[in-house]
Amino acid sequence: MRTPLTVAAIAATGVPVFAIKGETLAELEVLVGFDDDLAGEATRISNRIRGLLTSIHPSLERALGPRVTHPAVLEILSRHGGPQGLRKAGRRKLTTIATKHAPRMGARLVDDIFTALDTQTVTVPGTTAADTVLPKLADTLKETLQQRKSIADQIEEMLDAHPLSVVLTSMPGIGVRTAARILLEVGDGSAFATAGHLAAYAGIAPVTHRSGTSIRGEHPPARCPAWCRRRRVAVARRWWPRG
């Protein structure tokens, strides 16, 4: 049975995409799929934490939200919860926790926390309950991220056994997860007649827009496989991080 991905590849290259065979790649596909599920779960929990902080203490969310997946932030939330628990713990205890997990930014993180706490003088309804919920969410997120790390180690071990792994991981911005996904989707590339066919299929070859009266130049193609679009964004963020 042809999947939409297979149909798209045939349309782009004129060559059918053959299924990747082998026990190793079959196991790799299971691990990569599970890692994708864990990534979605981690995003969901992160958004839940940030949403809860926003509802009870917006300033604290601005201080912790962008760094919510950092081990120091998760440990602080896990032990002391929300605004009331953080203030009760005190600066010294939070600094001890933060510097253990983030030696360089620990003190600055605690300063940001207490600066945020001081900007809000009212207690919003639900703050007490948040002190109970936030540690549980932080623990769940820590466990999910740890599972992703463990799965990534297994993926890397399997990927190292493939002859194309060195080529893939040598490309700027491509790590273990992205390399594994590319390998699963395009195989060894033998299904594509030329590199240009593969580039067209992946949506990275420029397309010239022509009409009956003009040529508008070359632009990125509007269509490409969803997996490739997601990976391109991930690579770009890794290679050109936000300043």
What are the roles of these predicted feature ranges?
Residues 1-243:
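A detector of single, family-specific signature residues
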